[in-house]
UniProtKB/Swiss-Prot annotation:
Protein's recorded name: Translation initiation factor IF-1
KW NAD (keyword) present: no
Task performed by this protein: One of the essential components for the initiation of protein synthesis. Stabilizes the binding of IF-2 and IF-3 on the 30S subunit to which N-formylmethionyl-tRNA(fMet) subsequently binds. Helps modulate mRNA selection, yielding the 30S pre-initiation complex (PIC). Upon addition of the 50S ribosomal subunit IF-1, IF-2 and IF-3 are released leaving the mature 70S translation initiation complex.
Quaternary structure (record): Component of the 30S ribosomal translation pre-initiation complex which assembles on the 30S ribosome in the order IF-2 and IF-3, IF-1 and N-formylmethionyl-tRNA(fMet); mRNA recruitment can occur at any time during PIC assembly.
Transmembrane regions listed in the UniProt entry: none
Matching PANTHER family: TRANSLATION INITIATION FACTOR IF-1, CHLOROPLASTIC
Family indicated by similarity: Belongs to the IF-1 family.
Keyword Protease on entry: no
Cellular location(s): Cytoplasm
Length: 74
């Protein structure tokens, strides 16, 4: 799968799970299990429940995703 194939959506982190996994409620109402991308991990960006994030979903499995960006708080 190339980067162009990924589906990018926004959502809110609802739960923090072990091994840097998070449960994210997407804006369209779906609930996905997401892990942190390497750039977020390398730059020590903390993600907490309640944060708005961008999630990349694979077109093959829409229940799992990768958190690629934490959006700024308003």
């Amino acid at each position: 799968m190339s980067k162009e194939d990924a589906i990018e959506m926004e959502g809110v982190v609802t739960e923090s799970l072990p091994n840097a996994m998070f449960r994210v409620d997407l804006d369209n109402g779906f609930n996905v299990l997401a892990h942190i991308s390497g750039k977020i991990r390398r730059n020590y960006i903390k993600i907490l429940p309640g944060d708005r994030v961008k999630v990349e979903l694979s077109p093959y499995d829409l229940n799992k995703g990768r958190i690629t960006y934490r959006l700024k708080k308003k």
